[in-house]
Amino acid sequence: MAELVHDPVNRVRYAFQRDGENLIVDCAVDSGGSLPAHRHPRQVERWSVLDGQIRFRLGNTERLIGSADGEMVVTSDTDHGLANVSGREAHLRCRVEPALRLQAFLEESAAAARERLFTARGLPRGLAGARWAATFLERYATRQSFLNRRNSCSAP
């Protein structure tokens, strides 16, 4: 398995594997860990739960999914998020089509989480956090994400 990238704020560990222009992301989500609601303007995600129970939010709908439930497809520009409700570590796989800069986005945000540059609610922590957030948004946010904020964040 590839080297794991740890995000202590969301309580997730990622392993990345390129598949042509796509990206496979294996996620180990701690009990109670989550990925907050967000959207990808130009990417499709295909999520599979390998082990555990996940509360998956897709648009305005929430449902519990496990390994027997098959693949959850998230079309581009659709709000989505998830939380591990297993009471133990859960394992998921996500195929991202196309990869674009998602791996760099997740690696950089996980590094900032390890440096405690933002809070569990995603707010910058102090001046260093504000500087990091400004440069991070400059690199990764799209103009559309600012126009369509609707309480979510766009990720590449």
Model-derived features with residue positions:
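A short glycine-rich, His/Asp/Glu-containing loop-to-beta-strand
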Residues: 3-37, 43
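Solvent-exposed residues in well-ordered beta-strands and their adjoining turns
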Residues: 28-32, 59, 85, 95-97
